[in-house]
């Protein structure tokens, strides 16, 4: 019986964690508020990729890869995106 209770608790925790990783759609001011909050919490300042070129930053994929023609609005307003995607724009 204890094993069943432990198993159900474990499944519940896994379900909550996986639900928190699902993407959400952010548009307009909600997207701006979310970006400001995430970037502020992460301690990012908006700088260009060229600023980091001499500091060994090519190891960071979010700074070394080009996002192409798609922007944050295309990526997070038209389809759900996660916090990791949003953080890549900080």
UniProtKB/Swiss-Prot annotation:
Effect of residue 23 to R: In strain: Kinshu
First-listed, main subcellular location of the protein, grouped into a coarse class: secreted
UniProt cross-references to SMART domains, sorted A to Z: IlGF
Disulfide bond entries: 27-77, 39-90, 76-81
Propeptide residues, chain positions: 48-68
Leader peptide range in chain numbering: 1-18
InterPro entries the record matches: Bombyxin, Insulin-like, Insulin-like_sf, Insulin_CS
Keywords (A to Z) from UniProt: Cleavage on pair of basic residues, Disulfide bond, Hormone, Secreted, Signal
GO molecular function terms attached to this record: growth factor activity; hormone activity
Organism superkingdom: Eukaryota
Locations listed in the record: Secreted
Pfam families the record matches: Insulin (PF00049)
Record-level GO cellular component terms: extracellular space
SUPFAM superfamilies xref list: Insulin-like
Functional summary from the UniProt entry: Brain peptide responsible for activation of prothoracic glands to produce ecdysone in insects.
Further facts: Silk worm has two kinds of PTTH: 4K-PTTH and 22K-PTTH; there are many forms of 4K-PTTH.
Subunit structure: Heterodimer of a B chain and an A chain linked by two disulfide bonds.
Family: Belongs to the insulin family.
Protein name, as recorded: Bombyxin D-1
């Amino acid at each position: 019986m204890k094993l069943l209770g432990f198993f159900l608790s474990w499944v519940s925790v896994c379900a909550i964690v996986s639900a928190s990783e699902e993407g959400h759609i952010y548009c307009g001011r909600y997207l701006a508020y979310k970006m400001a909050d995430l970037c502020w919490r992460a301690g990012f300042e908006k700088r260009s990729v060229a600023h980091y070129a001499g500091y060994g930053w090519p190891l960071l994929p979010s700074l070394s890869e080009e996002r192409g023609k798609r922007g944050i609005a295309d990526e997070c307003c038209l389809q759900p995106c996660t916090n990791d995607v949003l953080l890549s724009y900080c």
